[in-house]
């Protein structure tokens, strides 16, 4: 009912991305994770339209002559991180937050505020969900789905999410 916007990789910043690269011995993965975080946080928390980020990725791929995001290397993600942070600054007039606690508070606030979004109101009306109920925030550690070709993530429901049947 709050529409379940997701922000992955919260806590990454210019400093922690280096630690993640060192810990995993995979700079490309770390930089890709950081740019994903900037994109999700920029969209969900800061209100930057997603197409601004997607357009940049597509332009990078065109310039390199590749089709897939997985064909971009660590240097490409470095460039995109800088460009993504510039988009955030241009659209919000603020620097992308480097303080992990401010990132967390921003994400939590965005989830609570999503309850009053037009999309959530329409969904609640269509599904007869009372507006007095409110929404919850889940903060959890997760595995990475973008660490390599043998990594993935998924969602499992124990009940039908549409009607609640077993």
Predicted regions and their residues:
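Nucleotide/phosphate-binding sheet-loop regions of phosphoryl- and nucleotidyl-transfer enzymes
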Residues: 1-166
């Amino acid at each position: 009912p709050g529409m379940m916007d997701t922000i992955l990789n919260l806590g990454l910043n210019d400093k922690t991305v280096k630690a993640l690269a060192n810990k995993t011995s995979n700079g490309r993965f770390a930089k890709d994770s950081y740019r994903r975080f900037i994109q999700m946080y920029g969209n969900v928390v800061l209100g930057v339209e997603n197409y601004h980020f997607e357009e940049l990725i597509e332009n990078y791929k065109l310039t390199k002559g590749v089709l897939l995001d997985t064909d971009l290397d660590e240097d490409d993600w470095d460039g995109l991180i800088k460009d993504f942070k510039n988009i955030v600054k241009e659209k919000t007039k603020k620097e992308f937050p480097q303080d992990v606690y401010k990132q967390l508070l921003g994400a939590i606030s965005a989830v609570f505020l999503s309850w009053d979004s037009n999309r959530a109101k329409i969904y609640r009306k269509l599904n007869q969900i009372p507006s007095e109920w409110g929404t919850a925030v889940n903060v959890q550690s997760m595995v990475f789905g973008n660490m390599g070709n043998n990594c993935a993530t998924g969602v499992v429901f124990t009940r039908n999410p549409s009607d609640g049947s077993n």
